[in-house]
């Protein structure tokens, strides 16, 4: 299990680097996302979906964690970290830069990540799997449009032609 987790960690870092995403370890990652172009975040989000659904190693890891979370506390924690609470908290930290409250940031994280998480299962059950990624793409585009409409930066960091995500 430790080798599987290490391989997953390596794949995560490599994918984040390939899509030029801010590093996840430093305290300033949420601030760094504020300056990441929307196109990169969109592409990375779609790549994450492909990672968890189409890449055999990662998809099998996800399925294993989904099943085994109910049998083994260690696997339940891994499921939480990789697929449930971990991504949700990560996104809430990013959205906290836009909102007035932690609750509002968490709601935005749920609004963004909830459909993605659901679509993992939709993908698994779909006879025509190629129909699922376009649903996620449409969700992400609508979410971005909503964020860009409702939330504005203050001062020098106003949106510039829709090039920034948050």
Which positions does each model-derived feature cover?
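Short, flexible helix-adjacent loops and helix caps
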Residues: 13, 17-20, 24, 53, ...
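Flexible "cap/lid" subdomain of the alpha/beta-hydrolase fold that forms the substrate-access gate
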Residues: 31-34, 47, 51, 55, ...
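Amphipathic alpha-helical packing segments from all-alpha helical-bundle domains
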Residues: 35, 39, 52-66, 70-100, ...
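Short alpha-helical transmembrane interface motifs in multi-pass membrane proteins
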Residues: 45-46, 76
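Short alpha-helical scaffolding segments that buttress acidic/His motifs in well-ordered protein cores
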Residues: 48, 62-66, 112-116
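Hydrophobic/aromatic-rich alpha-helical bundle segments in the mid-to-C-terminal region
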Residues: 77-81, 85, 95-144, 154-166
């Amino acid at each position: 299990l430790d080798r599987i987790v290490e391989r997953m960690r390596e794949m995560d870092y490599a994918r984040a680097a390939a899509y030029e995403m801010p590093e996840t370890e430093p305290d300033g990652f949420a601030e760094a996302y504020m300056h990441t172009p929307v196109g990169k975040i969109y592409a990375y989000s779609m790549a994450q979906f492909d990672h968890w659904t189409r890449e055999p190693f990662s998809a099998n890891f996800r399925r294993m964690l989904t099943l085994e979370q109910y049998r083994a506390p260690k696997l339940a924690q891994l499921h939480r970290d990789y697929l449930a609470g971990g991504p949700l908290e990560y996104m809430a930290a990013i959205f906290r830069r836009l909102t007035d409250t932690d609750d509002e940031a968490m709601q935005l994280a749920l609004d963004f990540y909830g459909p993605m998480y659901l679509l993992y299962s939709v993908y698994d059950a779909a006879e025509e799997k190629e129909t699922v990624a376009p649903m996620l793409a449409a969700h992400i585009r609508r979410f971005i449009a909503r964020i860009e409409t409702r939330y504005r930066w203050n001062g020098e960091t106003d949106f510039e032609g829709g090039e920034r995500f948050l």
